[in-house]
């Protein structure tokens, strides 16, 4: 249903977007202007599902103006489960976040705006830092002062004119390198992850190999024949968000 009446001003619409995002289930929400994200140089994404360079917002929406970045807290190990389906992994926690974001997309469309759910070649981590959600940590995750690394990101690109938030500029890592030292396979160096070395980036054959099999079973314990917990070692090592996660 398209909104009828005078269009909202940017501040009013921004406030409504943030209110709805929290009401739908997000714990964190921030706004980035499309031009600010596009000003970030294209960089390599070593994702578990694809590896390529980031794109500009106009790759998805010619008249893109704003990005909404949502942070959904993961407060229990159940949110870190992975299901092996035939020859690939599925992450049930992603479905929850996508549901919250999809509801916000429907609201924007009802306001007469265009909205793209999860433009996958735009860096959600860069969005999160630009939107003030946290800093890019040495474990390559976004670290929030309250939640630490224990939240997941969902994003929406829209032609709506929204009021951007201030970037996060504090350094929450400082001289700490606990996450780097904790990695069982040495996949981390400061602010960089080797996706081929990371347990979650390995092929199924590598995970069951003589070299990595025992490490895999220790850090990605099986729950059923086809379900396991993803490795959280570098997250557990982080000093931020520990109390809320029940680690202290």
Role assignments for model-derived ranges:
Residues 1-86:
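Non-catalytic, usually N-terminal nucleic-acid engagement modules in DNA/RNA processing proteins
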């Amino acid at each position: 249903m398209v909104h009828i009446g005078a269009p909202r001003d940017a501040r009013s619409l921004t406030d409504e977007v943030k209110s709805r995002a929290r009401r739908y289930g997000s714990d964190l929400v921030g706004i980035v202007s499309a031009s600010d994200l596009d000003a970030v140089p294209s960089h390599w994404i070593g994702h578990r599902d694809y590896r390529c360079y980031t794109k500009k917002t106009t790759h998805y929406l010619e008249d893109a103006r704003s990005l909404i970045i949502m942070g959904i807290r993961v407060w229990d190990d159940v949110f870190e489960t992975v299901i092996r389906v035939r020859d690939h992994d599925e992450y049930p926690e992603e479905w929850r976040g996508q549901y919250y974001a999809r509801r916000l997309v429907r609201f924007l469309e009802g306001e007469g705006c265009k909205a793209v759910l999860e433009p996958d070649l735009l860096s959600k981590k860069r969005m999160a830092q630009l939107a003030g959600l946290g800093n890019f940590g040495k474990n390559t995750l976004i670290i929030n002062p309250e939640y630490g690394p224990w939240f997941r990101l969902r994003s929406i690109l829209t032609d709506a004119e929204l009021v951007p938030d201030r970037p996060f500029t504090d350094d929450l890592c400082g001289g700490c390198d606990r996450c780097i030292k904790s990695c069982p396979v040495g996949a981390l160096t400061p602010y960089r992850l080797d996706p081929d070395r990371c347990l979650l980036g390995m092929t199924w054959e590598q995970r069951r190999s003589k070299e990595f099999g025992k490490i895999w079973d220790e850090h990605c314990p099986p729950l059923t024949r086809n379900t396991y917990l993803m490795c959280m070692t570098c997250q557990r090592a982080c000093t931020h968000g520990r109390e809320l996660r029940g680690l202290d």
